[in-house]
């Protein structure tokens, strides 16, 4: 079984985000965990597609995107398009869990 150190971008200093991601890559980190929060499904708001798209241009790490949002199936393709390599959703957040899983599988990324 493979194990991966997967630091969370949520703990980054956003004033130095690019530099910190570069440091992680230089240290051999292969995966980056990205918590996307919408302020509805969870009380906090983090960031979304523009941030992921921006860091994807600068990073070859595996992006493990955790959608902590209401009705995540509405956004799956958008997150795939901006660079997610893996998407995790909460079953209770989905309006249609089967559809969410189908969309992730059809995108050929990891669930």
At which residue positions do the language-model features occur?
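Conserved N-terminal beta1-alpha1 strand-loop-helix module at the mouth
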Residues: 1-77, 81-82, 88, 94-96
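Extended, positively charged loop/linker patches that create polyanion-binding surfaces
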Residues: 97-102
């Amino acid at each position: 079984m493979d194990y991966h150190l997967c630091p969370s971008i949520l703990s980054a200093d956003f004033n130095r985000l690019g530099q910190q991601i570069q440091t992680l890559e230089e240290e051999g980190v292969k995966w980056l965990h990205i918590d996307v929060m919408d302020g509805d499904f969870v009380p906090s708001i983090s960031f979304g597609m523009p941030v992921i798209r921006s860091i994807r241009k600068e990073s070859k790490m595996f992006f493990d995107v955790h959608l902590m949002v209401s009705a995540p199936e509405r956004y799956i393709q958008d997150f795939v398009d901006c660079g997610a390599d893996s998407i995790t959703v909460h079953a209770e957040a989905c309006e249609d869990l089967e559809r969410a899983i189908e969309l992730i599988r059809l995108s050929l990324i990891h669930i």
